[in-house]
Amino acid sequence: VSAIINMAHGRLGDAFVDYLKRVNVPFFAPLNVNRLEKKWESDNMGMNGGFLSQSVVTPEIDGALRPFALFAHYVGKDDLEYVAAMPERLGTFVQTVNNYIGLKHKPNSQKRVAIYYYKGPGQNAMTAGGMEVGPSLYNLLLRLKQEGYNVAGLPDSAEGLMQAIQRQGAVFNLYAKGAFDDFMKNGKPALVSKNDYDSWVKKTLRPEKYQEVVKANGEFPGEFMATPDGKLAVARVQFGNVVLLPQNAAGKGDNAFQIVHGTDAAPPHTYIASYLWTQYGFKADVLIHFGTHGSLEFTPKKQVALSNL
């Protein structure tokens, strides 16, 4: 047994949890959105109420992961509804399962890990509801090192890590041109070209969704984190096969609280490019959001049972 996929509704119980502990394999619980595919696509909620608790929350008690919307209702020739996998999502789910299985056999020294942290602009501290983010992140990196992950160049202390983050992994205000110029000289950012960005966007975003990005932010690279030759800078701190990245602002404006906790506008190119670089440029095997929260869970529309972008 390499993985378990459960398409039922609710918990399987403590006996199943004991079984999972013995076999030590990932347990997936893909979602049935319980309505016509078109209605689910147009619904801003995705899933709520009893279906949310029974399809997402209770399976997670058993250890289920990846609540991926996979099944929907369709109308047959007899005008009766039937359940089937959504064709454009089935391949993604299968690839996800195979990726998890592959990680079990890949040496830790070869695994590539991306860790996002939330941080305010400039010299603001990394935040997570009172948690000591810097020391906690450093302890995680030490544990990864002990487990055989490649963290070459990791500083000797948490203070050294924080200095590296302030130098290479900062978040800038829109008008902090002097700080940005210094960052470009000394911060060792990843640079995303228009060709790469366009290629990654085509793989990831639906054309109509990307047009919302362009309408809100202009054409790539936009006005923020852009270089004179038309590239987009991605702040990152890399130690071997582990990269730390700040979560960029999910919108524009001076109200940082509103930008983080809810904006209806499409995110800027910087926000999208960072995640696309992590996936396609850095080729991360694992992505972690470290801390209590950032802006990801406050982005517009569906929060669970997400549709394709």
List where the protein language model places each region:
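An N-terminal assembly and electron-transfer interface module characteristic of large anaerobic redox
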Residues: V1-L309
